[in-house]
Amino acid sequence: MNRCHFASFLSFALASPLSFAASKKITPKANSALVVVDVQNCFVEGGTLPVQNGKDVVPVINRLATQFDNVVITQDWHTPAHISFASSHQGRKAFEAVQLSYGQQVLWPDHCIQGTPDADLVSSLHIPNAELIIRKGYHQSIDSYSAFREADHKTGTGLTGYLRERQIQQVFISGLATDFCVAWTTKKCPLKGHLYN
């Protein structure tokens, strides 16, 4: 793979996400891919772990996705009693940190449990050209923020191979939440390249 360029698309964090998107000239090529991270009911208003104004990112991503031939969606997909849930650690509360075999882990409220409406993609997310959904965080004893690799830094999700097989050289990353899953996806991508904010 040659150079890869990463764009962390932080639209929901801004006061006016649509004007931000309009101000950025994103010109994908045939060897570009858009990775849409965790735009799920659990991470928007009314969900179990909501990102403030999370739904504001959806129309921006819908519009952006129409420009790409290659689109991948990720989905947080936890088992009940997942190791990252505070409820799985007696006497612990959500947002406390604990040390686990793979490193420090923030404990979360139960969220994005497999097969529940909370784990579903937001219904207004409309990306019919998406070719792949990567489910992450489904190993009960390992959390996963990155779309590429679980938090143990060993277990891959399959996304790297998918992008290499398609000879993708430019990756744009969008979604929820920029402080965790979007950030980790951007930082942990195993492909060489540059980060553009």
Which residue ranges define each predicted feature?
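Residue-level marker for buried hydrophobic side chains located in beta-strands
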Residues: L34-V35, I73
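Glycine-rich anion-binding loop/nest that anchors nucleotide
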Residues: I168-W184, N197
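Active-site alpha/beta core segments
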Residues: P59-Q170
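C-terminal segment of N-terminal export signals and the immediately downstream linker at the start
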Residues: M1, L18-A33, N41
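Active-site metal-binding loops of divalent metal-dependent hydrolases
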Residues: V39, D76-W77, L176-T178
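N-terminal export signals
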Residues: C4-A22
